[in-house]
Amino acid sequence: MLSVVILFLLVAENSSQSYTGNPVICMGHHSVANGTMVKTLTDDQVEVVTARELVESQTLPELCPSPLRLVDGQTCDIINGALGSPGCDHLNGAEWDVFIERPNAVDTCYPFDVPDYQSLRSILANNGKFEFIAEEFQWNTVIQNGKSSACKRANVNDFFNRLNWLVKSTGNAYPLQNLTKVNNGDYARLYIWGVHHPSTDTEQTNLYKNNPGRVTVSTKTSQTSVVPNIGSRPLVRGQSGRISFYWTIVEPGDLIVFNTIGNLIAPRGHYKLNNQKKSTILNTPIPIGSCVSKCHTDKGSVSTTNPFQNISRIAIGECPKYVKQGSLKLATGMRNVPEKASRGLFGAIAGFIENGWQGLIDGWYGFRHQNAEGTGTAADLKSTQAAIDKINGKLNRLIEKTNEKYHQIEKEFNKIEGRVQDLEKYVEDTKIDLWSYNAELLVALENQHTIDVTDSEMNKLFERVRRQLRENAEDQGNGCFEIFHKCDNNCIESIRNGTYDHDIYRDEAINNRFQIQGVKLIQGYKDIILWISFSISCFLLVALLLAFILWACQNGNIRCQICI
């Protein structure tokens, strides 16, 4: 009898070609065969379905002239452009957001130095325009418009066209010059002037008569007085003399006084300063192209929406922040649990507790069902969109917080300011170290939150279905519910869209639940019968063995001795 029942069950399993059990609906999430590893607060390697790289490492091979206006200095740096050196005439009236200085820029006029080079360079760059206003200067009994063979323009001796070299008169006179200019305008004026340092005393007297000369330039709040430093120097473009250029800013209502008895390189006017402008300068050999980008580095323009970059510390415009890391991945999907390859003899389905689902194209979260009409999969767009909105929101905020506008991280200093340069680099290195650490921590925190959010949305979906089904179904513990009533595809759809009415199916579900539990109870006796049968069989086998031994002993076939 027992063997017949077992044989019947085996035949039923092998011959079953369609699903005849109770309907089952499962909640699950999207998965892929190979996810992306991200870092969280608690784990260095967490596999997620999708992630976005936040660190940009690629640049365009050119500088983009739009939307920022770029001015190419070509062979002229910005100071030579302001002085009016030969070869820099193309910069007259130039206006820029970023002034492009080239590493191969050269001086083309009389050799000079600027004691406060970096400050003047910064003022000119920030001004964003070479707006030169010519003025009338009444110099007394001196020869103007001095020229030099070191300063050729069209193969003719010339000089800086924004400056006026004053020398003694033909009558061998260089009287005291005392000239005042009042700023009656509504903007600040930048005056650039110089002091000539001859190579010998003879040159000093030949040019200016007075030895030593002196130049004093004053405003209401400042005064600069320079005595020429006469001495021989290495020849540069045939000259051993030098010019030192200085600058003075005259605010509206203030005045400037030039006082000299020789050696003055006088201005021909002033530059109009625009305090509202926020421009800058970039030293790079990268050519200007025809692309569009709001971010420029010395290695090329950057076109990206990533919040970080490890291309260059020097970044100008609306640029990602520079970090040391080569990669920071932000999770944009849930934790990845690859789908199992096999689903068993019945093709059984499982929910999110066991694994994810591959091929859930329409959304991250969804349903799978199994009923008399077959199996199916559908996305749950509401929970998916809720998670996407939260992730996109944090990504946008991250990008918005880290964009830099017209910020140059690394500055340049001349050799005289070496100690300042070392200090500045130390400060910048420290800032970059701190920000790189903060960026890594921020991304890890966001990744942790993303995984928590996506897990939470999955649990919300599961709880929503559980509240709908109530006693009409049983939680199988793997993200699925076994439904105790007939549930066709329309019924399944009502569960998915939240319109399921459990009262309609309540009576049928209760009856089926009791019947199924009764069958399970009856089927439970099979195990008891099997154990009883096994025990009786073992007892009979032992009894037969003992009977055989006793029979053999009586017939003398077996001899038994007991020793004490």
UniProtKB/Swiss-Prot annotation:
Mention one GO biological process in which this protein takes part, according to its record: fusion of virus membrane with host plasma membrane
Which residues fall in a coiled-coil region? none
Instruction: State any GO CC term.
Output: viral envelope
How is it modified post-translationally? Palmitoylated.
Cysteine pairs bridged by disulfides in the record? C26-C480, C64-C291, C76-C88, C109-C151, C295-C319, C487-C491
Q: Which InterPro entries match?
A: Capsid_hemagglutn (IPR008980), Hemagglutn_HA1_a/b_dom_sf (IPR013828), Hemagglutn_influenz_A (IPR000149), Hemagglutn_influenz_A/B (IPR001364)
Task: Using the UniProt record, give the first listed, main subcellular location.
Answer: virion
Q: What is the topology of this protein in the membrane according to its UniProt annotation?
A: Single-pass type I membrane protein
Q: What does the UniProt entry say about where the protein is found?
A: Virion membrane; Host apical cell membrane
Glycosylation site list: N14, N34, N178, N310, N497
Which GO MF term does the entry hold, naming one? host cell surface receptor binding
Recorded hits in Gene3D superfamilies, A to Z, give: 3.90.20.10, 3.90.209.20
**What role is this protein assigned?**
Binds to sialic acid-containing receptors on the cell surface, bringing about the attachment of the virus particle to the cell. This attachment induces virion internalization of about two third of the virus particles through clathrin-dependent endocytosis and about one third through a clathrin- and caveolin-independent pathway. Plays a major role in the determination of host range restriction and virulence. Class I viral fusion protein.
Question: What's this protein's name?
Answer: Hemagglutinin
Which species is the source of this protein?
A: Influenza A virus (strain A/Budgerigar/Hokkaido/1/1977 H4N6)
